[in-house]
Regions:
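Nucleotidyltransferase catalytic core that binds NTPs
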Residues: 1-128
Length: 128
C-alpha cells in the first residue's frame, strides 16, 4: 500500500501529441532541468542522466523533467513495426521511471510533426 508521501512524490506524466502542447506546459512552469531520450531499458547511463537532471534541478530551484517517446523514433522513421525489439513495454518503462524523484515525465508521440522539425526548432519549443 502506498503512503501519502509516496503518492505526492510521484511524477506528473504528460502524454504529448503536438509540440505546442509541450511548449504550453513548459511555459507554465518556473523552469526545467531536462533530459531527453528513448530510455528503453534503464541502464546505468540512463540512471546517471536522470539522477544528474534531478540534482541540477534542485541546485537551480527548477522542476526536473524527463522527455521520452511513446513510440520508437527508429520504428517510425524506418517504417518497421517490430514490438519485439523493445527492452521494456510502455507500462514497464512508466513504472520504472516513476520510481525516480523526477517532477514531470513527458511521453511525446513521435510523428510526422516531430520528424520534420529541425533540431534547432525542437529546442526552441523546449526553451520557451
Amino acid at each position: 500500500m502506498l503512503k501519502n508521501t509516496e503518492i505526492l512524490n510521484m511524477p506528473v506524466i504528460h502524454k504529448i501529441t503536438h509540440l505546442s502542447e509541450l511548449s504550453k506546459i513548459i511555459k507554465s512552469k518556473s523552469g526545467y532541468s531536462m533530459t531527453i531520450g528513448v530510455f528503453d531499458g534503464i541502464h546505468l547511463g540512463h540512471q546517471f542522466l536522470i539522477n544528474e537532471t534531478i540534482k541540477i534541478a534542485k541546485n537551480q530551484n527548477h522542476n526536473s523533467c524527463l522527455i521520452s517517446f511513446s513510440n520508437s523514433p527508429y520504428h517510425f522513421l524506418t517504417k518497421k513495426n517490430d514490438s519485439n525489439n523493445y527492452l521494456s513495454t510502455k507500462y514497464e518503462k512508466t513504472n520504472i521511471l516513476s520510481n525516480y524523484k523526477i517532477d514531470d515525465i513527458f511521453f511525446i508521440e513521435f510523428n510526422d510533426e516531430i520528424a520534420n522539425t529541425k533540431a534547432y526548432n525542437f529546442l526552441e519549443y523546449l526553451n520557451t
